[in-house]
Amino acid sequence: MKKQFGKFGGQYVSKELTSTLKNLEENFFKYCNDDDFKKEYIYYLNNYIGRPSLLYYAKRLTKSLGGAKIYLKREDLNHTGAHKINNAIGQILLAKRMGKKKVIAETGAGQHGVATATAAALFGMECTIFMGEEDIKRQKLNTFKMELLGAKIKPVKSGNGTLKDAVDEAIKQWVKSSDDTFYVLGSAVGPHPYPTMVREFQKIIGEETKDQILRMEGRLPDTLIACVGGGSNAIGLFYPFIKDENIEIIGVEAGGKGVETGEHGAAFADGRVGVIHGMKTVIMEDDNGNVKEAYSISAGLDYPGVGPEHAYLNDIGRAKYVSITDEEAVEAFKYLCANEGIIPALESSHAIAYTMKLAPNMDKDKIIVVNLSGRGDKDVETISEYLNK
């Protein structure tokens, strides 16, 4: 199994974690090629999560923008309301096969926390979620859901109290307790094998999209668009299309208050190659080599780096990465609500916002597929506060 994507990825970890990661890699490789494991995973995708998720032709959105046809991949309709459950079920099934009794996870927007707590409840495992204090304030609804599902929440006070800090604390805990504990990492980040493992559990998004668009349109789309924090929903959509070279692939990062202000989460716009959370990738660093704090109105996008496979796709020119500001994302959130009766997550609203810029400049026979990675119930309070400022 490849440990790197070009010069990105790898395993930049302490000695204590090396053997744990080797054991994880061996088990993942063993079970992802095991028919019984695959059968069980697909059973839960279909009968618990509710897959395949719909590919929906957004007729009014298309008409109002006046350009390319827009399809939405409806990951918001999954059980728990986002794409995160695809990966959580896969990793916890693996944890059970490995004989682990407990799971830990980090969360930003709370969606991965809810998905992990849900899967832990389903399979009867003890669950602890690390969440930044700032994110707990922003995501009260998801915090309460996790507690209802039986998870213990560990507030993280260090740093800015956001996603990066939650990952730091979760990794520290894992070093101490890896004998009986499995770390369910929520995005396509971290040391090998996590970026590959998360992609493998999320690529169902792109595989379904391929089948669905061929059935509906008789051809593949021209453009794929997805939001990118760490980038698991995006790599899940993109991966099955990478070899289809005529398809444009666009990842949308958090522009926050504007890249020029320094308050954003757009690593590609303002980053350099460095090491974070056990991987080499593109990260936001200051001149002294310290990781900058990321900012976004969206709790799931304020990560100061990107998954290493995204860094590689950008490096070889196979995908391009753009940014959308808070203001643009909120406008897109409102626009989709008003035009399609769909309340998107703030993360997904970044992808919708870029689609709103791009689609009117494309011919009407062109096709865009946007990954609607999650639903926006969790964000309604944040939006309300933002609009009433």
UniProtKB/Swiss-Prot annotation:
It comes from the Bacteria. The keyword Lyase applies. It holds the Pfam family PALP. Its cofactor is pyridoxal 5'-phosphate. CDD domains: Trp-synth_B. The modification N6-(pyridoxal phosphate)lysine is found at K84. GO terms for cellular component: cytoplasm. Keywords: Amino-acid biosynthesis, Aromatic amino acid biosynthesis, Lyase, Pyridoxal phosphate, Tryptophan biosynthesis. Coiled coil: none annotated. It catalyses: (1S,2R)-1-C-(indol-3-yl)glycerol 3-phosphate + L-serine = D-glyceraldehyde 3-phosphate + L-tryptophan + H2O. InterPro entries: Trp_synth_b_CS (IPR006653), Trp_synth_beta (IPR006654), Trp_synth_beta/beta-like (IPR023026), TrpB-like_PALP (IPR001926), TrpB-like_PALP_sf (IPR036052). Its EC number is 4.2.1.20. One of its GO terms (molecular function) is tryptophan synthase activity. Pathway: Amino-acid biosynthesis; L-tryptophan biosynthesis; L-tryptophan from chorismate: step 5/5. The beta subunit is responsible for the synthesis of L-tryptophan from indole and L-serine. Tetramer of two alpha and two beta chains. Belongs to the TrpB family. This is Tryptophan synthase beta chain. It comes from Clostridium novyi (strain NT). The gene is trpB.
